[in-house]
Amino acid sequence: MEVKIKQVDEVKISRYIIKETMEDWYQFVESDVVIVGAGPSGLSAAYYLAKAGLKTLVFERRLSFGGGIGGGAMLFHKLIIEKPADEILREVNVRLKEVEEGVYVVDSAEFMAKLATAAIDAGAKIIHGVTVDDVIFRENPLRVAGVAVEWTATQMASLHVDPIFISAKAVVDATGHDAEVISVAARKIPELGIVIPGEKSAYSERAEELTVINTGKVAEGLYAAGMAVTEVKGLPRMGPIFGAMVLSGKAVAEEITKDLLKSEIRT
């Protein structure tokens, strides 16, 4: 095959990448919402928040999105979705196979790819390779007001490097089972009054509903979604059924949208 490829030298490659990257960081250093974790609940939240017109930034410590979706069920590449979560997947064009009334099997790769694409197309910004290791807080009134971030590679190398800060009107902990952001806030800002009982063992039927019901605000400016909810509220886990994860993301997005529009503090 004969093809004429545009020639681009190394200096231009570097300049364009640096310039465009810095412009993104400059724009999103003040965000409406920062979501920590690009798993199913984080991506679902990002999709609905961005659709609502909020400046939404997602930090993911790994170099890929999807969180627990990619691992499927013990590395099997299929997952379960149940009603009414199927409506969200249909909205982002994920194909579902109904195996009994109201119960569906989905392909894990398609699920995470299309959910992430939907969030990006709605306007959310996803940045990989960044770890959130602390929060910003303010007093009068006491609230969480953003996050401190560092390159994941820097932390893995155990280098002593200070973070940079990202302001946000709302921070969503979508980090999964350990609720890492809320755990840091609970430990370092005891005035917030956050008590974390820890996640219980599996009870799928109850866990799905309880996770969605308990999704939302943990402290002013700080919210829990997905498996972080089970950790913070002492709820059972559910395994490779993901309906509650995407429903939790939608629920937290709706709550934040109402809170920010009500207080009229959007960026």
UniProtKB/Swiss-Prot annotation:
It catalyses: hydrogen sulfide + glycine + NAD(+) = ADP-5-ethyl-4-methylthiazole-2-carboxylate + nicotinamide + 3 H2O + H(+). Pathway: Cofactor biosynthesis; thiamine diphosphate biosynthesis. NAD(+) binds at S41, E60, R61, G68, V132, H160, V161, D162, M227. GO terms for biological process: thiamine biosynthetic process; thiamine diphosphate biosynthetic process; thiazole biosynthetic process. The keyword DNA repair does not apply. Its EC number is 2.4.2.59. Fe cation binds at D162, H177. InterPro entries: FAD/NAD-bd_sf (IPR036188), Thi4_fam (IPR002922), Thi4_prok (IPR022828). Its cofactor is Fe(2+). GO terms for molecular function: iron ion binding; pentosyltransferase activity. SUPFAM superfamilies: FAD/NAD(P)-binding domain (SSF51905). Pfam families: Thi4. The keyword NAD applies. Keywords: Iron, Metal-binding, NAD, Thiamine biosynthesis, Transferase. It is an enzyme of class 2 (transferase). Glycine binds at R237. Belongs to the THI4 family. Involved in the biosynthesis of the thiazole moiety of thiamine. Catalyzes the conversion of NAD and glycine to adenosine diphosphate 5-(2-hydroxyethyl)-4-methylthiazole-2-carboxylate (ADT), an adenylated thiazole intermediate, using free sulfide as a source of sulfur. Homooctamer; tetramer of dimers. This is Thiamine thiazole synthase. It comes from Saccharolobus islandicus (strain L.S.2.15 / Lassen #1).
